[in-house]
């Protein structure tokens, strides 16, 4: 059985919040950045009206078309595939955004088969060996696998030590963590 890796899409493969901040600032004369978001809950970080405007931008095609990949995410995903791992993209996106997301993934990650793109709200239902996400709630709920959080301002101050979640700051660290998990799991299986 091949080693299965679940990669979250938004803010792990793409720079969604960076793109949304840019459009929000242009349209509202504001100056917010990713650092504004010290919680995954947008409504805790912005006044209600601004939070409503911000979240509405997630449903605009022009925002999805402006997304760029997270630095080294293409290299990292390809390296995992080249190392023989099964890589799946997992996303809790709104259904109306899904076609734009799939199109974006096909443009920037053409080496990932479309059948490996999974739209799912409850990621704890996934049977994978490693899950990589920026939302700690997705990781804390899935105790059956190795877990990696890509550090972002909204998860930086969370207390996740008790959950055995590996914290990484970039894709080089993510690839190294997956390779280490694989090595450890192989050793366990051989004993």
Task: Give names to the regions the model predicted.
Residues 132-169:
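Acidic, Mg2+-coordinating phosphoryl-transfer loop and its flanking beta/alpha structural elements
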Residues 1-53:
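Active-site neighborhood of HAD-like aspartate-dependent phosphohydrolases
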Residues 40, 121-128, 155-157, 171-176:
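A short acidic, often aromatic-flanked loop/helix-cap motif at beta-alpha or helix-coil junctions
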Residues 104-120, 162-179:
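Structural recognition of alpha->loop->beta junctions
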Residues 64-68, 73-105:
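Substrate-recognition element of Asp-dependent hydrolases with the DxDx(T/V) motif
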Residues 32, 39-78:
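Metal-dependent phosphoesterase signature
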């Amino acid at each position: 059985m091949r080693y299965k890796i679940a990669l979250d899409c938004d803010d792990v493969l793409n720079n969604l919040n960076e793109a949304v901040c840019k459009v929000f600032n242009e349209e509202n004369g504001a100056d917010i950045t990713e650092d504004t978001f010290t919680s995954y809950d947008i409504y805790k970080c912005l006044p209600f009206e601004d939070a409503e405007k911000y979240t509405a931008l997630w449903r605009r095609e022009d925002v999805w078309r402006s997304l760029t990949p997270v630095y080294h995410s293409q290299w990292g995903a390809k390296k995992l595939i080249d190392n023989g791992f099964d890589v799946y993209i997992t996303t809790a996106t709104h259904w109306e955004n899904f076609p734009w997301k799939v199109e974006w993934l096909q443009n920037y990650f053409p080496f990932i088969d479309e059948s490996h793109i999974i739209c799912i709200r409850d990621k704890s239902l996934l049977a994978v060996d490693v899950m990589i996400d920026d939302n700690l709630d997705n990781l804390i709920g899935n105790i059956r696998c190795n877990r990696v959080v890509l550090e972002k301002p909204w998860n930086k101050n969370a207390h996740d030590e008790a959950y055995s979640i590996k914290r990484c700051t970039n894709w080089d660290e993510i690839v190294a963590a997956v390779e280490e998990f694989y090595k450890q799991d192989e050793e366990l299986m051989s004993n």
